[in-house]
């Protein structure tokens, strides 16, 4: 595509905070469609380097003059209000010049215009389920455009401008921005109280999902997980409004009929096999997965129904999903050393922690020996305050837990809230580690052959996985006198 096929306001843009995952994804699509992109960010990153290689002009640091990086100026400035304050000098300068300032969700909605859109939302599992739907359509030769919150393993990116008629995207519910979209198919994985710092009440948080579903395009469909009470209730309310609802879930539901049923599921190593029943078919189908966890099998059903709804053949979809390799930071294998496997996971809500550790426990159990060690970093003071006890209970699925201090992100500290707030609710052996720089050595010293270590959280805990692997290898070097390259 050429710049003429972009809306005029998106042909020459400046992006404030361009290095963030969501913003970088938008930048990739704009560049691929022939747009001119400049941007700024607080620091260098892999995402910044990749965008420069694609032609974006990026400055580190924020200054009003950054709006002049593109010769001839810009037609709009794009930002994300969650991370960028209104006092940012580039935003102040844009307003002074009369340059329109648009939020990322508004831009994404413009990029989806004219496409058949599949959007996935929910408290948990939306990145993985979105990625599954993308892989399913890719395997069927549809080449969808997509924008997702995590890096898709198969594609090595979180955004793509495709040649097909489809656009698959994750709809973030954290700040109400999902109300910018009008999808043809909406998948809701689950609904459970979260982001109360923004919404103020559970009722307000739940209400945004109802408002989102009411924005479905005419003739659109809602796909929901009937196993989750929150999304099941949404399905009932939506059906009463005349919205077409497709439910998926486990066998044995006494409520409304399921469009896709998980009849059986069996963990096999880091994958699984399952039997599923589709409505209208006489016999169940076999389904293979390359990712662990029963919750992943349910996510597959959501992606499957979404793909079928836009015309993808069932058999081809299942073949594609069998090869789904996962999403970066979703139970991602970081490395192995000294017979210790180290994984990294993005889980940052008690329900996510519980589901992930249940899956990991199955992996540990099948290996025959070894323990499960979890390095957990609470994310946001408000979330830690609200769910400290629930986090402690979820972490009890591990054999040993290392709790770090809270990753503040956009928040200011709250008096009396720290990693200790979570650690005090853990009943298995637990250590509260305040010194981030010492964590890798402490965990490596605690791990033994056959153990599985999981670093967990939405913050910079992800940096520790490689450090733990390196510490384990250093331990191996020290234990082998005379090994080449090892100082004696």
Swiss-Prot record:
It holds the Pfam family Mur_ligase. ATP binds at residues 122-128. GO terms for cellular component: cytoplasm. The keyword rRNA-binding does not apply. GO terms for biological process: cell division; cell wall organization; peptidoglycan biosynthetic process; regulation of cell shape. Gene3D superfamilies: Mur ligase, C-terminal domain, Mur-like, catalytic domain, NAD(P)-binding Rossmann-like Domain. Signal peptide: none annotated. It is an enzyme of class 6 (ligase). It catalyses: UDP-N-acetyl-alpha-D-muramate + L-alanine + ATP = UDP-N-acetyl-alpha-D-muramoyl-L-alanine + ADP + phosphate + H(+). GO terms for molecular function: ATP binding; UDP-N-acetylmuramate-L-alanine ligase activity. The keyword Nucleus does not apply. Its EC number is 6.3.2.8. Disulfide bonds: none annotated. Pathway: Cell wall biogenesis; peptidoglycan biosynthesis. Keywords: ATP-binding, Cell cycle, Cell division, Cell shape, Cell wall biogenesis/degradation, Cytoplasm, Ligase, Nucleotide-binding, Peptidoglycan synthesis. Its main location: cytoplasm. It is found in: Cytoplasm. Cell wall formation. Belongs to the MurCDEF family. This is UDP-N-acetylmuramate--L-alanine ligase. It comes from Mycobacterium ulcerans (strain Agy99).
């Amino acid at each position: 595509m050429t710049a003429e096929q972009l809306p005029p306001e998106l042909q020459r843009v400046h992006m404030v905070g361009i290095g963030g995952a969501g913003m970088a994804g938008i930048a990739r699509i704009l560049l691929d469609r022939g747009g001119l992109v400049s941007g700024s960010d607080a620091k260098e990153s892999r995402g910044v380097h990749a965008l420069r290689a694609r032609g974006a002009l990026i400055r580190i640091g924020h200054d009003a003059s950054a709006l002049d990086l593109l010769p001839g100026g810009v037609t709009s400035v794009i930002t994300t209000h969650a991370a960028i304050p209104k006092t940012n000098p580039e935003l102040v300068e844009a307003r002074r010049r009369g340059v329109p300032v648009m939020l990322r969700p508004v831009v994404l909605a413009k990029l989806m215009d004219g496409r058949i859109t599949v959007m996935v939302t929910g408290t948990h599992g939306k990145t993985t389920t979105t990625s599954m739907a993308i892989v399913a359509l890719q395997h069927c030769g549809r080449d969808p455009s997509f924008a997702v919150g995590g890096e898709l393993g198969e594609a090595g990116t979180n955004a793509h401008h495709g040649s097909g008629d489809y656009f698959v995207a994750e709809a973030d519910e954290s700040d109400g921005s999902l109300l910018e979209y009008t999808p043809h198919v909406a998948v809701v994985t689950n609904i459970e109280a979260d982001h109360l710092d923004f919404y103020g009440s559970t009722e307000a948080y739940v209400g945004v999902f109802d408002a989102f579903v009411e924005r479905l395009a005419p003739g659109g469909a809602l796909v929901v997980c009937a196993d989750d009470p929150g999304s099941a209730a949404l399905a009932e309310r939506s059906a009463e409004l005349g919205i077409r609802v497709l439910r998926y879930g486990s066998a044995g539901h006494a409520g409304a009929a399921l469009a896709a049923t998980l009849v059986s599921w069996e963990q096999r190593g880091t994958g699984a096999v399952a039997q599923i029943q589709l409505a209208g078919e006489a016999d169940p189908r076999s389904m293979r997965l390359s990712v662990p966890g029963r919750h992943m099998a349910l996510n597959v059903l959501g992606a499957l129904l979404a793909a079928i709804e836009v015309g993808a053949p069932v058999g081809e979809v299942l073949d594609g999903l069998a090869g789904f390799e996962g999403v970066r930071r979703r139970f991602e294998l970081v490395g192995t050393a000294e017979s210790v496997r180290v994984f990294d996971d993005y889980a940052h809500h008690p329900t996510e922690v519980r589901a992930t550790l249940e899956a990991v426990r199955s992996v540990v159990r099948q290996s025959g020996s070894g323990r499960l060690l979890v390095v957990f970093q609470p994310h946001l003071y408000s979330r830690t305050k609200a769910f400290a006890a629930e986090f402690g209970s979820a972490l009890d699925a591990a054999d040993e837990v290392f709790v770090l201090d809270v990753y503040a992100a956009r928040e200011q500290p709250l008096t009396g809230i720290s990693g200790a707030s979570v650690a005090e609710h853990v009943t298995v052996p637990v250590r509260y580690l305040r010194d981030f720089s010492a964590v890798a050595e402490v965990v490596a010293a605690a791990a033994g052959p056959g153990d599985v270590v999981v670093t967990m959280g939405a913050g910079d805990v992800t940096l520790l996985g490689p450090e733990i692997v390196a510490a384990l290898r250093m331990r191996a070097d020290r234990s082998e006198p005379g090994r080449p390259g090892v100082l004696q």
